């Protein structure tokens, strides 16, 4: 059985638990999905497009690497998908939260096609997930006289990735849910015993409040009752023990 058909079976299994499809994090699975997108008459083409665009785990996963590489091919015209034009490809790269997407954006910004380089630079100026290897590439290009690299560095120096964000609303309506009272830690919301599921946020959510489904449903119901407000969890405690980045 192909990885794709195994994934479809997993989707059916998750439906029984009230879960949406798990985000794709495996490059081998995404490669099959991309191959199906490239085949105009493939029966799973539409589903594959949706998985590719909306359901690939971003960051440094192997699937993110495969997605970024394919988006680069689309931008350079080395591959073609009618539903993903150049603007759409850049938009998807902008939401991929670092890792291989930044590498691709730098390749394009420092490349030979000026129009593409300018578009890539505009996206890079909005990104915050750059690491030393990425900034080293920009520094080297700047020192070599690359004008676009210099422009990107100036943008970062002026913090345009922050100053160009939309203004915070004058008024923010919130509704609070007291998550716990007394001696608690982040284990209440993200139990260490369920650490294996943290990459699958929807599944991991079922462990909130120590697997207390009554309280989980109370929180979801609160959200339904106040669709125009933001739900804030409030731990009524002077300090909260934090042993990791879970908070």
Q: What residue ranges belong to the model's regions?
A:
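N-terminal glycine-rich anion-binding loops that anchor highly charged ligand groups
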Residues: 2, 41-44, 182-187
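Amphipathic alpha-helical packing elements
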Residues: 3-39
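Short amphipathic alpha-helical segments that mediate assembly, nucleic-acid/protein binding
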Residues: 4-7, 30, 45, 67-68, ...
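Structural detector for internal amphipathic alpha-helices that build alpha-solenoid repeat scaffolds
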Residues: 19-23, 46-62, 76, 83-98, ...
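Amphipathic alpha-helical scaffolding segments comprising HEAT/armadillo-like alpha-solenoid repeats
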Residues: 27-35, 58-77, 98-110, 129-141
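Generic amphipathic, hydrophobic interface segment in small proteins and small subunits
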Residues: 34-51
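Fe-S-dependent hydro-lyases/dehydratases of central metabolism
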Residues: 95, 107-110, 115-247
């Amino acid at each position: 059985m192909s990885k794709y058909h195994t994934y479809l079976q997993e989707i059916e299994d998750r439906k029984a638990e009230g879960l949406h499809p798990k985000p794709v994090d495996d490059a081998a699975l995404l490669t099959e999905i991309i191959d199906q997108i490239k085949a105009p008459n493939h029966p799973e083409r539409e589903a594959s497009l949706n998985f590719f665009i909306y359901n690939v785990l971003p960051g440094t996963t192997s699937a993110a690497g495969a997605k970024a590489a394919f988006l680069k091919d689309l931008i350079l015209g080395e591959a073609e998908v009618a539903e993903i034009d150049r603007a759409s490809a850049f938009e998807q790269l902008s939401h991929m939260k670092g890792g291989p997407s930044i590498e691709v954006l730098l390749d394009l910004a420092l490349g030979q096609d000026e129009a593409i380089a300018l578009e890539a630079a505009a996206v890079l100026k909005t990104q915050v997930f750059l690491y030393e290897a990425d900034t080293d590439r920009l520094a080297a290009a700047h020192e070599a006289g690359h004008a676009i690299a210099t422009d990107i560095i100036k943008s970062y120096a002026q913090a345009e990735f922050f100053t160009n964000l939309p203004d915070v609303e004058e008024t923010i309506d919130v509704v609070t849910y007291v998550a716990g009272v007394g001696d608690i830690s982040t284990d209440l919301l993200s139990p260490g015993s369920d650490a294996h599921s943290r990459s699958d946020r929807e599944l991991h959510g079922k462990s909130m409040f120590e697997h207390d489904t009554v309280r989980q449903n109370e929180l979801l119901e609160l959200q339904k009752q106040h669709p125009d407000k933001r739900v804030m969890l409030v731990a009524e405690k002077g300090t909260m023990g934090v042993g990791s980045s879970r908070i």
